[in-house]
Amino acid sequence: MAILVTGGAGFIGSHTCVELLEAGYDVVVVDNLYNSSKKALDRVEQITGKHVTFYEADILDREALNAVFDKEQIDSVIHFAGLKAVGESVSKPIEYYYNNIAGTLVLCDVMRKHGVKSIVFSSSATVYGDPAFVPITEECPKGKCTNPYGQTKSMLEQVLEDIYVSDHDWKVILLRYFNPIGAHKSGLIGEDPKGIPNNLVPYVAQVAIGKLECVGVFGNDYDTPDGTGVRDYIHVVDLAKGHVAAIKKMEKSEGGVQIYNLGTGKGYSVLDVIHAFSKACGKEIPYVIKPRRPGDIATCYADPSKAKAELGWEAHYGIEEM
């Protein structure tokens, strides 16, 4: 069985490729390398001793996608490709809506044309907006998303649900992740963004090695124990294993739309993460308090019990191991 992984050279994508290969799947990756590197896939091959078929292509490029589906025997798609920085999405809404929405529509159209109707979609806890309650279950109403990035995820969930309504042969699994951090135990792959990182942990790491001066903590006046934002940080290997569990679930299902939260069920503040990192690397991480970022919320963590019950999946790593 070949699984097409869009955005497979990225942080979560590359870790998912490792888990898929180790579970015995053939993996085909489509990635435009906008915020990733082919080196990640070379390292995936090094870790697993298995081959990854790679196409450098954009999901907006219908011709390129058609060529991939013509050439490869694709059974299912795991769709990661897209722009993903919350803060940047506020300043570049047109790019985010165009890339994420139009790209996914092109992908789904090409899938339909080739009779491939199984997709695991990389969604996000941002679809809950400022959540009505925590811990967040899948029944928590989708809120008003506080940024265009979250809005694209919410809209694409609706698109995929509508596709299923129109054609009951489709199998759709929406995975709403919380905050992925950490790296593969080999140390060969991890989060390696081009330019200044948008996510907390790679930023902290670059401060730790002296690449950046100090960590900017956006807001310390939230209604949380230490005033900084609380998030559910999930190890990327746990998250990757969740995608394999979703593919296995889809193989046995008849069709339909399933939604799962992938998180640990525990919330940690920004300062908790900085202090844990300081402890792990044995040096103080300097930080400075900055104004809140537009689109950020106070508290967000998962109730992951549905994924445990239905996918047989749960997170194993704690914050110290991340």
Language model features with spans:
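Pocket-edge positions in alpha/beta enzyme catalytic cores
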Residues: 57, 69, 96, 192-196, ...
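C-terminal substrate-binding subdomain of Rossmann-fold SDR/epimerase-dehydratase oxidoreductases
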Residues: 200-322
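Residue-level detector of secondary-structure boundary/capping sites
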Residues: 24, 150-151, 195, 264, ...
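A generic fold-level signal
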Residues: 91, 99, 143, 167, ...
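N-terminal Rossmann-like NAD(P)+-binding domain of SDR-like oxidoreductases, especially those catalyzing
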Residues: 1-183
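Short-chain dehydrogenase/reductase
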Residues: 97, 146-154, 190-198, 202, ...
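Catalytic core of nucleotidyl cyclases, primarily class III adenylyl/guanylyl cyclases
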Residues: 186-188
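Short, basic/glycine-rich phosphate-binding loops at helix/coil junctions
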Residues: 182-184, 221-222
